[in-house]
């Protein structure tokens, strides 16, 4: 059998369904309503909450969440953002959260580490121009957070003294000593 660990892109959904008809296949990540394939769904709202709680505990009240496009196709991405925003709202600071997502036309592009890094970088540059009072920026995932970090540092700001940066997924890169990214494992209990 096959364990498929991400949602198939539109361009390969048909192939994945054909494969599932021949070989036992399960998707671990998000339940895609349009696919007739077994799936183990992750709770994508869950990681957003501890990221927000961590920042609230550090005293952050003006934060941004940087994301790939938040389209109907990417409902799971939206759940992570919603969990983050909900935590700030429940603490009484919902007005201090900015959600900055990439243009919807980028949703048709198969995401790569390079494109996610660039999204984090360019969206953060925009955020820093538009919002001088931000004290923390969160990336939907670690690759976006790496782009955020470079944009912050290039703007002559210090991490975490001036702006805190948080990622999600706890990728191997986040543990490199030279990077020092605060990140959360997606599989939060």
Tell where the protein language model's regions lie, with residue ranges:
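Bacterial carbohydrate/catabolite-sensing allosteric modules
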Residues: 13-189
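Central regulatory/effector-binding core of bacterial HTH transcription factors
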Residues: 1-10
């Amino acid at each position: 059998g096959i364990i498929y660990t991400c949602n198939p892109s539109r361009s390969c959904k048909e192939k994945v369904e054909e494969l599932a008809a021949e070989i036992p296949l399960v998707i671990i990540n998000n339940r895609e309503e349009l696919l007739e394939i077994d799936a183990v769904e992750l709770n994508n709202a869950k990681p957003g909450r501890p990221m927000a709680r961590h920042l609230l505990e550090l005293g952050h009240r003006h934060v941004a969440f940087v994301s790939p496009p938040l389209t109907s196709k990417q409902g799971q991405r939206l759940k992570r953002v919603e969990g983050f925003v909900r935590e700030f709202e429940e603490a009484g600071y919902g007005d201090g959260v900015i959600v900055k997502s990439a243009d919807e036309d980028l949703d048709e592009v198969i995401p790569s580490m390079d494109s996610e890094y660039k999204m984090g970088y360019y969206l953060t540059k925009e955020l820093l121009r538009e919002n001088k009072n931000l004290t923390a920026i969160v990336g939907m995932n670690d690759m976006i957070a790496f782009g955020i970090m470079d944009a912050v540092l290039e703007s002559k700001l210090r991490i975490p003294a001036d702006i805190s940066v948080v990622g999600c997924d706890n990728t191997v890169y986040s543990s490199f000593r030279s990077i020092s990214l605060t990140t959360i494992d997606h599989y939060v209990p």
